Amino acid sequence: MTSVLSSTPTSIPIIAGAQEALRDTLQQPTSVQYVPAAATSSLSDNVQLQSSNDSTINGVVIGLLSSFGSAILIALIFLIVYFFKYTSSGRILLDRIGRPGEYDDEQAFAKEEAEALEEMDDLQRTEYLRAKAFVQSNPPDSLPTDISLSQYLAIQEKGVSAWEFEPELEIANCFVEARTEIEFFDSECCTLTNLPVPKQNEVYYWESKIYDKPENTLISIGVATKPYPLFRLPGWHKYSVAYTSTGHRRYNQPFSGPVYGPQYVQGDVIGVGYRPRTGTIFFTRNGKKLEDVAHGLKSQNLFPAVGANGPCTVHVNFGQSGFVFIEANVKKWGLAPMTGSLAPPPPYGSEQGSILLEAGRESAQSSNGYYQPDPRHGRTRSGNFRHGPPTSPGPLRSPTDISLAQLTHIPSHEEPGEASNSSTPAPTGNTTTQPGLSVHDNAQPPPEYTSPLPSEAGSPRGSTDGERTPMLRRKTTPPPIPSYNDAVAQRNRSNSHRDQVGSRRERSDSHQARHGDGSPSRS
């Protein structure tokens, strides 16, 4: 290479230029490699800040677009539902979007009615049309069925005993005994209570026990409104709900009913529950709760109803005894308390002027101030004389005193002008009678009389818990009553003794008179 350079001197500038170019080329990466550290860090921060700002803006934009998109989607769905629900005639969208819907209740009922009438015989068709005409002419709750004031007071006084079943006398196919024991016979009918189910509490509940049920008898237990065709079963017409013995549920129609629960037979207990706030009806069977059967029955007054199409016996418990359903027993879901809260009427007493009790009082006094004994039990000491008028003229009264006492005439033997307080004159005859005693003739004796036994009912000795009750009682026998002959003989002896005393008094008076006349001559 040296030889080449030396041999060609004209190529020296060209080689020098190439060397300078090569030197610049080799020095260029060195200048990039030694960039200062401060410049490098500032450049990286700018790049990172720019990338973070871009990501924040992108997140905000995405969030706004998603929210607006969700709102637009919800509004679009709402418009579609509103359009199909309120603009399609004859169809109602019931559940999912895209389902074609079902006919409303009236159209479905008309369709079921037309199909059922074709399958009915003449008697069933006649009974159904008769009940339909009754419901159309007597809509539910067309009569006032709210609890009146008198019924409310009866509930307060009697408690749950105020409810009772009222059978239709014109049908005469069921008999009610002891208010809640129902016996059905050979044709179809039902019976409702006289009072509706209250609405004050949270839940009301009642049970029915099947005492007697043949296999071919259909029983329907539930609630219904008044007026209701009593020649039909509950659940067959508006508004009524029932649980039948075949295990089906009946709600306002007799054509077809879905299977609701197990069948019930003789010995089973069927309960009916009502929630007034939500209008929900549910049933129980032998203490086990079944699912709800109806909702929204809040405005109607519902009456417990029991019906059957054949012979059977059903006993209803409104709360007068314990329930089989334990929850109803604990929470006291009966229609009313077992006993009433009002006190019974006040008892009649002697202080209230009770005529019934005054008639039996032994110490009754008459208005004239003396005792008037009952003529059926009146007797004297001898037992052979009847009571006469009083022997005493009574207390002295002034001439201006007005009294309603009986006036008794007393014969007087005093001479005119003598004082009323003079001594009683001596008897003038031998036939002196005692005042107040009427003597019978010996030839016509009165009938034998037996006095009643003495009673201590009105005395303190007759009571058993009084303070004056004697600790030891002695039975005293009444004295014997003499016969009529003994009484006549005793009266004759008393009359003869009185005559002897009178004759002695007369002799003594005459003797004193003779001695009194001769005394002046001796003086």
Swiss-Prot record:
Glycans are attached at residues 421, 430, 492. Residues 1-59 are cytoplasmic. The gene is ssh4. This is Protein ssh4. Residues 81-523 are lumenal. GO terms for biological process: protein transport to vacuole involved in ubiquitin-dependent protein catabolic process via the multivesicular body sorting pathway. The chain crosses the membrane at residues 60-80. The lineage of its organism: Eukaryota, Fungi, Dikarya, Ascomycota, Pezizomycotina. Gene3D superfamilies: 2.60.120.920. Residues 419-436 have a biased composition (Polar residues). It comes from Sclerotinia sclerotiorum (strain ATCC 18683 / 1980 / Ss-1) (White mold). Keywords: Endosome, Glycoprotein, Membrane, Protein transport, Signal-anchor, Transmembrane, Transmembrane helix, Transport, Vacuole. It is found in: Vacuole membrane; Endosome membrane. InterPro entries: B30.2/SPRY, B30.2/SPRY_sf, ConA-like_dom_sf, SPRY_dom, SPRY_Ssh4-like, Ubq-SigPath_Reg. CDD domains: SPRY_SSH4_like. It is a single-pass type II membrane protein. Residues 127-323 form the B30.2/SPRY domain. Residues 361-400, 412-523 are annotated as: Disordered. Residues 496-517 have a biased composition (Basic and acidic residues).
